A protein has these predicted regions:
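Core of compact, soluble alpha-helical bundle domains
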Residues: 1-198
Length: 198
């Protein structure tokens, strides 16, 4: 865990940035989720200083599996890691760049490229984010990115990650019928694009 008040402050700043980027976290997990995000951030900050990248990568793979299976897609973890690195770089600009997360982050990019292609995946996310914004009723920012990430998690062997997210996004008590239809259409499109990239 962080050892000084400054390190704790940096970890909490990174947690705040990750939390605020994805309103989904607050909508779904509330204050309890914020506390978990803060504690995860302190642990991630500690990993950023770990001496061996291979150990860090294994720890991040474990955390990814835990989070994705609970409805928190890997893209949120990636964003959190980036926020940790940014907080460290801003506070200590003269220190060498931290590389402990590089292998894990590079693997995630390669995974997305392999499963849906870089351009196809980005295009689908853009199109469906516009469609989600146009839906009536309750709306969650960046939903298409989250759904696409959960789809990648599921197709990368994290069983149950897609329903852990999409069951919440298709709850008729929470979301409109047009929103729910778009969730299902995005999943169909991801399957279609995946079939073309094989």
């Amino acid at each position: 865990m962080p050892q000084t008040p400054l390190e704790i402050d940096l970890a909490l700043r990174a947690a705040k940035a990750a939390w605020e980027k994805y309103s989904y976290l607050e909508h779904r997990y509330g204050e309890r989720g914020r506390r978990f995000t803060n504690s995860d951030s302190c642990w991630l900050f500690t990993l950023a200083r770990a001496p061996r990248e291979i150990v860090v990568t294994k720890d991040l793979e474990w955390l990814r599996t835990v989070l994705a299976s609970r409805g928190i897609p890997t893209v949120i973890l990636e964003s959190h890691l980036t926020a940790v690195l940014l907080a460290i770089d801003q506070e200590f600009p003269n220190q060498p760049k931290k590389i402990q997360f590089d292998h894990f982050l590079a693997d995630r990019k390669a995974e997305r490229r392999r499963l849906v292609g870089a351009e196809s995946g980005s295009h689908l996310v853009e199109v469906f984010d516009q469609r989600f914004r146009a839906c009536t009723g309750f709306n969650v920012e960046l939903a298409a990115e989250l759904i696409a990430s959960a789809w990648v998690d599921e197709h990368s062997g994290i069983s149950g990650s897609l329903p852990a997210l999409c069951n919440w996004f298709t709850d008729g008590e929470r979301f409109s019928t047009d929103w729910i239809a778009n969730v299902h259409e995005l999943l169909v499109e991801l399957d279609r694009v995946h079939g073309q990239t094989r």
